């Protein structure tokens, strides 16, 4: 039986690290595509050299030719530019829209049966770009955000409680930005609600630090952003889809009335399996949680409205 195939478009820090993590899981052969001549080829060869020591034996190929993504089961879009000094939000939106649109066109042409994971920022809006450009079914296009935000939340909780990271289960909904919605009421340590383990002031501080988690890393790096945890999040999603693991995790998906939200990509809990988004889970949110989610949705909607002023899908 042929091994599954993952193609990663954009071989910068997130894309290349995601390729490495997926290789270590030995769940698929990997193609990395980037417009930078020689970079993907070098990284692919470096990964292959590490295989005998790290215990993986998969095909890893680097290319500048988008036709090499043909017949991929999964396509990951990490290509995009970070915001530079002097660049306003709309300029960044236009630049990354063009990049993601180009990637999505190649996916639709060469890998029409693939499931798509979008990583490029602004995440929730770029999901709309990929979805509209590919014309794929909604279950086959999703964004990586909630898993990353939730794992940051889990880490901060574990640090405060002093427990094992794996004992913490957490859920973060909403857009991938300052208005994300960490849910303390759905966060537990070995089944015990964190509200029984931590004071409200501590929980509030953790929630705020989670919202600023990416910015905190950018503040330290000065000239870059996080990539190990985002790449690990991509690898978790890839494994769930390619092995049909039925993982329940928050992802940016297209809502059609769930949570009272229409026609918008936003982070909610879903079941991931071989068909992509196999089920959207509707949590019983209280009034304050729902208000926060609606506020987050409004922020995403503003970005989509900005997109609609210039975007032509095909």
Model-assigned labels for residue ranges:
Residues 134-139, 149-287, 291-314:
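C-terminal substrate-binding/catalytic lobe of Rossmann-fold NAD(P)-dependent dehydrogenases
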Residues 88-154:
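Rossmann-like NAD(P)(H) cofactor-binding subdomain of soluble oxidoreductases
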Residues 15-16:
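N-terminal Rossmann-fold NAD(P) dinucleotide-binding loop
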Residues 53-114:
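Rossmann-like NAD(P)-binding element
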Residues 24-29, 135-137:
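Conserved S-adenosyl-L-methionine
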Residues 11-12:
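Glycine-rich Rossmann-fold phosphate-binding loop(s) that bind the pyrophosphate
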Residues 33-72, 301-312:
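Conserved N-terminal Rossmann-fold NAD(P) cofactor-binding segment
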């Amino acid at each position: 039986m042929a091994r599954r195939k993952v193609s990663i478009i954009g071989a910068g820090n997130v894309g290349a690290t995601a390729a490495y993590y997926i290789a270590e899981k030995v769940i698929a052969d990997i193609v990395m595509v980037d417009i930078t001549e020689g970079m993907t080829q070098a990284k692919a060869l470096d990964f292959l050299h590490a295989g005998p020591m790290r215990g993986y034996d998969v095909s890893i190929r680097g290319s500048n030719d988008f036709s090499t993504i043909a017949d991929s089961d999964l396509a990951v879009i990490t290509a995009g530019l970070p915001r530079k000094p002097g660049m306003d939000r709309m300029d960044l939106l236009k630049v990354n829209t063009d990049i993601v649109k180009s990637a999505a066109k190649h996916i639709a042409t060469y890998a029409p049966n693939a499931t798509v994971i979008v990583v490029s920022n602004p995440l929730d809006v770029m999901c709309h770009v990929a979805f509209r450009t590919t014309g794929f079914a909604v279950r086959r296009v999703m964004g990586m955000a909630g898993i990353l935000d939730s794992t940051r939340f889990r880490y901060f909780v574990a640090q405060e409680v002093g427990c094992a990271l794996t004992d913490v289960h957490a859920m973060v909904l909403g857009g991938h930005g300052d208005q994300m919605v960490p849910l303390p009421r759905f966060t537990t340590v070995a089944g015990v609600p964190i509200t029984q383990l931590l004071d409200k002031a501590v929980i509030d501080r953790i929630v705020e630090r989670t919202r600023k988690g990416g910015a905190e890393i950018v503040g330290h790096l000065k000239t870059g952003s996080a990539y190990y945890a985002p790449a690990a999040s991509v690898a978790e999603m890839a494994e769930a889809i390619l092995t049909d693991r039925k993982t329940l995790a928050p992802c940016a998906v297209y809502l059609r009335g769930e949570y009272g939200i229409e026609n918008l990509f936003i982070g909610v809990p879903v079941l991931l399996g071989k068909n992509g988004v196999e089920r959207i889970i509707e949590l019983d949110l209280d009034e304050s949680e729902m208000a926060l989610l609606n506020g987050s949705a409004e922020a995403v909607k503003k970005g989509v409205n900005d997109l609609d002023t210039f975007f032509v899908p095909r």
